[in-house]
């Protein structure tokens, strides 16, 4: 995993896990875009393996499926699930509580109550894995 904040800032929230082979990057500031595009990841987010995050904002309790691509200026609000292999194109603003899938990603349906609960569970699970590793237990 590489999080490269060479020309803008990167923020990773509490309880968030960023899995193997993920690339996080930012966009530089320009006259047209004085803030550029930082990478902001909220609390209790699971970012699956081999995801590309580029200058986007992800809210709290989200799951970004393996192999997904999230482009500049995308706004993902709290409690969103992005299906594996999806691409969210530049500048899209998604809706909370929804499952998005495809290339380009489109809203498929509302998340179930169980799926919404799973978003937090997933992040907490990886926190337990980390704690078990550090304590020498499995």
Describe the predicted segments one by one.
Residues 6, 12-14, 19-27, 31-41, ...:
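Glycine-rich hexapeptide-repeat left-handed beta-helix
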């Amino acid at each position: 995993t590489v999080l490269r904040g060479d020309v803008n800032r990167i923020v990773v929230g509490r309880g968030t896990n960023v899995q193997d082979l993920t690339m996080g990057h930012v966009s530089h500031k320009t006259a047209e875009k004085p803030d550029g595009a930082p990478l902001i990841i909220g609390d209790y987010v699971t970012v699956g393996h081999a995801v590309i995050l580029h200058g986007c904002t992800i809210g709290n309790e989200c799951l970004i499926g393996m192999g997904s691509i999230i482009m500049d200026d995308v706004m993902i609000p709290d409690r969103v699930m992005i299906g594996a292999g999806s691409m969210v194109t530049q500048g899209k603003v998604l809706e909370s509580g929804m499952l998005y899938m495809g290339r380009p990603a489109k809203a498929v349906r509302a998340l179930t109550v169980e799926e919404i609960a799973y978003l937090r569970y997933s992040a907490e699970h990886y926190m337990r894995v980390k704690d078990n590793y550090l304590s020498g237990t499995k």
